[in-house]
Amino acid sequence: MITGPTSGLGTGFARRYAIDGHDLVLAARDVERLERLAAELHDEAGASVEVLPADLAIAADRAKVADRLASGVRILVNNAGFGTSGEFWTADFQSLQSQLDVNVTAVMQLTHAALPPMLEAGTGTVINVASVAGLLPGRGSTYSASKAWVIAFSEGLANGLGGTGVGVHALCPGFVRTEFHERAGIDMAGTPSFLWLDVADVVRDCLADVAKDHVVIVPGLQYKVLTTGGRMVPRNLVRAMTKVVRRGRGRT
C-alpha cells in the first residue's frame, strides 16, 4: 500500500513497485488522479491496482485505510504528508492540526494496523517518508517537528522489531522536484540547483538502502554530507546554516 501516490515520491514508488511486479493498493483523496494513475499502471506494467479514496486528515478515512491494512499487505509506504507556508503564529490552527493528523497520526495509525499481519507472516516492510527537515532545524517548526517524530518513531520500531523479519525505515529526502512546495505555497526561488533531487533517484536509493536494512535513509551525497555535519557541530551553528540555505522560504 502507498499513501499519497498521485504525485511526487508517491507516484515514483507506485511506478517502481508496479514495474517490479507488485500488486498495489493506492490511497489518496484525489479520486480522479487516483483512478487515472491506477489505469496507467495497469496499462504500462500490467499491475493489479486497488484504489482506496481517503483523506488522511479525516479520522473516519484513516480508520478505513487502517481496516484495509489489517487484512494484510507486504509493504506499506506512508508517503502522504504536506507542509504549509507562513509563520506558525499567524497560520490557521486547523491547517496546522490537519498537518499533524496526516504527517503524524496517520503514520502511527496505519503502521499500527499493518504490523500485526506482517509479524504473523514473518515478513514485511514499512517505509515512512520523513525529511531532512526532521534531522536539521529550520524555519518549518511544525513540519520539521512532525518529520522528526517520524524518524524517532521509525528508529524505535526498527529496534523493537529486530529479528522478526519485519523492517521499518525512515526515508529522509531533501528538496525533491515534485509539486510539494508549490502546493504548500512555499517560494523556492533561488534554491541552489545542487540541492535538488529527482524522484526516480530518491526511490532507487531508498529501495537499495531498504535491501541493506538501513533504518534512516538519506538520499543524495549532498544531503549525507549536510546531515552528517549537522550531527558533528553545535546546534546553534546548524540553525545558523539552515537559515542561510532556507532564507525566504517560509514554512510552518
Describe the function of each predicted region:
Residues 21-37:
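Conserved glycine-rich Rossmann-like NAD(P)H-binding loop of the short-chain dehydrogenase/reductase
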Residues 170, 190-226:
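C-terminal helical subdomain
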Residues 131:
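Residue(s) in the substrate-gating loop at a strand-loop-helix junction
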Residues 111, 146:
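Active-site helix of classical SDR
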Residues 79-84:
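Conserved NAD(P)H cofactor-binding loop of Rossmann-fold oxidoreductase domains
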Residues 6-7:
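Conserved glycine-rich cofactor-binding loop
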